[in-house]
């Protein structure tokens, strides 16, 4: 009986993995289906021109869908943006904050609000894409074959439906597969560009533009970089939490202790993404602008990859968003109040305000180290890309996303296997009884 249960659990895990792979294949297949009315040759030249801008980063996150202007061109970014906006608003807007406290019902309402906002953001972005495409004329001709109202309407509908389909597929992976669906869709998009980046590097080495020793050093550097990311992403500061003893009749209950883990990098990959988006926005405007403004050209030059001003601003913005997003993710006052509510306390700290201030003190130190870690991880690839013209798909943000998704998925698989073994053990105990 126990063997049959274990076999059933194992088959369920395999089915979940197969389902996840199947859905990800659908996502990749959709990224090669172009929207109607586009000149592929003219579009290719524009995509190549914007490789170093914010479009290059979003093209990387979409797995090349934006560069090919496929039905998944907007990728799942509108949904992520909507989720972040709702998360930010839940801190400042009281009704949303109250919804978060309503448990599962509140969570469903917040998810519904995120979907509505996703449709709105995707519609605005899709319309912006349609208008931009109509205004672009290359050496080979206009990008849009027959511009007009019909093209705008069909483009908006196609791109919005594509985003909502990706969002739904991501939810299906989360519910019926393994791992976080949204993260895995971004992950598969990023790694799809890795083979071309490796081929590009070897091509540069073959032509003599990149020495073989440098190519080997870059490969070794990638391995070291991934190891560093894994170390820092798994790093935690454990705070001792004590529960008081309670006497009920002649028996004494409680008195146990546990640990509250605080991640070194609480903010995750959000700070580099936000920082990159802000810094690369002027360069993107310049690429789409037909006028040769001196101010715009100067901004484009000084905010280019690897430039000193770009790096300084990049680090400053990463540090700022690290503190900003950590304050949203971890509410010190709320956590301290929850501990006091359950009778728990930090040894040596009074429950309430004193505990909250202690959390702030610890988080500030962790965030400084975490911000420096994120800055270093993101700057090193920037310098390499600037010097050796390595593809953007090997940027620091890419490494952070890929490693985080892999770690999260492996953790979920381990948790699933552990829970299956636990259920098997409990069933065995019940049978014996």
Curated annotation (Swiss-Prot):
Its lineage opens with: Bacteria, Pseudomonadati, Pseudomonadota, Alphaproteobacteria, Rickettsiales
Which SUPFAM superfamilies does the entry link to? Answer: Preprotein translocase SecY subunit
Q: Which GO terms describe its cellular component?
A: plasma membrane
The signal peptide stretch is: none
Organism encoding this protein: Rickettsia bellii (strain RML369-C)
What's the encoding gene here? secY
Give the Pfam families listed for this entry: SecY
Protein name according to UniProt: Protein translocase subunit SecY
Instruction: Name any Gene Ontology BP term.
Output: protein transport by the Sec complex
In UniProt terms, what function does this protein have? Answer: The central subunit of the protein translocation channel SecYEG. Consists of two halves formed by TMs 1-5 and 6-10. These two domains form a lateral gate at the front which open onto the bilayer between TMs 2 and 7, and are clamped together by SecE at the back. The channel is closed by both a pore ring composed of hydrophobic SecY resides and a short helix (helix 2A) on the extracellular side of the membrane which forms a plug. The plug probably moves laterally to allow the channel to open. The ring and the pore may move independently.
């Amino acid at each position: 009986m126990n063997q049959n249960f274990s076999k059933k659990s194992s088959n369920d895990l395999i089915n979940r993995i197969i389902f996840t792979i199947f859905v990800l294949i659908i996502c990749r297949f959709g990224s090669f289906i172009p929207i109607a009315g586009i000149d592929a040759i003219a579009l290719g030249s524009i995509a190549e021109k914007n490789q170093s801008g914010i479009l290059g980063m979003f093209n990387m996150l979409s797995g090349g869908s934006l560069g090919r202007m496929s039905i998944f061109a907007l990728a799942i970014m509108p949904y992520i943006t909507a989720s972040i906006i709702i998360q930010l608003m839940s801190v400042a807007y009281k009704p949303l904050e109250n919804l978060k406290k309503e448990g599962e019902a509140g969570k469903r309402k917040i998810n519904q609000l995120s979907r509505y906002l996703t449709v709105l953001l995707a519609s605005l972005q899709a319309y912006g894409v349609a208008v931009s495409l109509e205004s672009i004329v290359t050496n080979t001709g206009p990008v849009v074959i027959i511009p007009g109202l019909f093209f705008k309407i069909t483009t908006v509908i196609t791109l919005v439906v594509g985003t909502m389909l990706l969002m739904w597929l991501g939810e299906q992976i989360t519910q019926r597969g393994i791992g976080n669906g949204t993260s895995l869709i971004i992950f598969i998009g990023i790694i799809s560009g890795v083979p071309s980046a490796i081929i590009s590097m070897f091509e540069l080495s073959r032509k003599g533009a990149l020495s073989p020793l440098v190519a080997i050093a870059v490969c070794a550097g990638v391995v070291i970089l991934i190891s560093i990311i894994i170390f820092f992403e798994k790093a935690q500061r454990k705070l001792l939490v004590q529960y008081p003893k309670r006497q009920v009749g002649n028996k004494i209950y409680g008195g146990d202790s546990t640990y509250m883990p605080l991640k070194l990098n609480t903010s995750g990959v959000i700070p580099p993404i936000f920082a990159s988006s802000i810094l690369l926005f002027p360069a993107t405007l310049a690429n789409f602008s037909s006028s040769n403004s001196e101010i715009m050209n100067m901004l484009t030059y000084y905010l280019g990859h690897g430039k000193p001003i770009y790096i300084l601003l990049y680090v400053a913005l990463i540090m700022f968003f690290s503190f900003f997003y950590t304050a949203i993710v971890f509410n010190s006052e709320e956590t301290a109040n929850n501990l006091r509510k359950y009778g728990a306390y930090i040894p040596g700290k009074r429950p309430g305000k004193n505990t909250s201030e202690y959390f702030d003190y610890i988080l500030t130190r962790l965030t400084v180290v975490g911000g420096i870690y994120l800055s270093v991880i993101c700057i090193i690839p920037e310098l390499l890309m600037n010097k050796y013209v390595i593809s953007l798909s090997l940027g620091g943000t890419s490494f952070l996303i890929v490693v985080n998704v892999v770690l999260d998925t492996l953790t979920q698989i381990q948790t699933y296997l552990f829970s299956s073994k636990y259920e098997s053990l409990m069933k065995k105990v019940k049978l014996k009884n």
